[in-house]
């Protein structure tokens, strides 16, 4: 009997471990961060956060709306609350009418227009590369930053994908470079896929050439591709962070004389998709590079790129 109890306890522990690993660590951290805000709301108002009740969740959504929180953030918080309940073995009906009807009302009152971060378009990127070349910085640091930005743009990378690259993920071929993405936001089970980045005609802005230059000068043979510098521009073997990418982008955008307030690490990815759409690339070829599973976001980039193409007003002669 004791052995049976021990075995069941072991199975329960393994099951909980499986549940905790059903999502990526980044996703799990995001869930916990969102739930902490909900937990704080519950503590302040004398509610129980785990397990909770649909009516309490609905009140929380109204509270977020009153704080002028974006619709996309409110939706994400709702998903996080439901997901953590499920992972802890509690049932929470996030489709309950008191939640759904309230959320629909919030959307109608607030509107759902999204003002995302600005895309870093190809001409902006070229301007940044020119600025980097003129900086009074060690050559090795300039090479890293150019390779980081050009590869990030050309591959339509998410920040986490970019900083997670290791030397064993890269293969230089006649046509350019193949880069293996072992795991991504839309590939939770690590099936992986490969991005192919061809040579650019202008070597100054060629991601393949600049990546080679960086690897040759840094002499990196294994481990992280994009690493940090210590004080005195001494190379380390410590991987860059997500935040580092955003800070590098914003810093150089500012140095070009452009207002950097609406740019982020995501600007490389959205910039690639928008620039590719402007150049006439098909939806499926953009998705093949970015790894998008849904067409919704890609079509938003294409719509933005086509604002002045086939514009009805251009047919009117004034």
Predicted segments with their positions:
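Extended, non-catalytic subsegments within catalytic or DNA/protein-binding/adaptor domains
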Residues: 1-318
């Amino acid at each position: 009997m004791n052995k049976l109890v021990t075995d069941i306890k072991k199975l329960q522990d393994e099951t909980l471990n499986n549940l905790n690993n059903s999502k990526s660590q980044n996703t799990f951290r995001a869930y916990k961060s969102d739930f902490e805000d909900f937990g704080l709301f519950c503590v302040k108002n004398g509610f129980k956060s785990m397990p909770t009740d649909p009516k309490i969740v609905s009140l929380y959504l109204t509270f977020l709306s009153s704080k002028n929180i974006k619709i996309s953030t409110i939706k994400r918080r709702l998903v996080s609350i439901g997901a953590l309940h499920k992972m802890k073995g509690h049932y929470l009906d996030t489709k309950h009418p008191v939640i759904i009807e309230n959320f629909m009302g919030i959307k109608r009152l607030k509107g759902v227009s999204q003002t995302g971060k600005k895309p870093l378009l190809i001409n902006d990127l070229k301007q940044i590369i020119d600025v980097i070349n003129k900086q009074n910085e060690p050559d090795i640091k300039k090479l890293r930053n150019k390779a980081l930005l050009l590869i990030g743009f050309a591959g339509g990378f998410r920040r986490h994908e970019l900083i997670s690259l290791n030397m064993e993920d890269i293969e230089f071929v006649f046509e350019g470079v193949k880069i293996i993405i072992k795991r991504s936001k839309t590939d939770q089970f690590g099936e992986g896929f490969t991005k192919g980045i061809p040579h650019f005609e202008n070597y100054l802005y060629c991601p393949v050439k600049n990546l080679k230059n960086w690897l040759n000068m840094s002499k990196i043979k294994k481990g992280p591709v994009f690493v940090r510098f210590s004080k005195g521009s001494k190379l380390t073997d410590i991987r860059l962070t997500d935040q580092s990418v955003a800070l590098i982008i914003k810093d150089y955008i500012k140095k070009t004389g452009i207002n950097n307030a609406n740019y982020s690490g995501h600007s490389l990815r959205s910039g690639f998709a928008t620039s590719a759409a402007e150049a006439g690339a098909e939806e499926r070829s953009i998705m093949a590079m970015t790894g998008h599973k849904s067409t919704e976001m890609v079509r938003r980039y294409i719509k933005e790129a086509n604002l002045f193409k086939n514009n009805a007003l251009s047919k009117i002669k004034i």
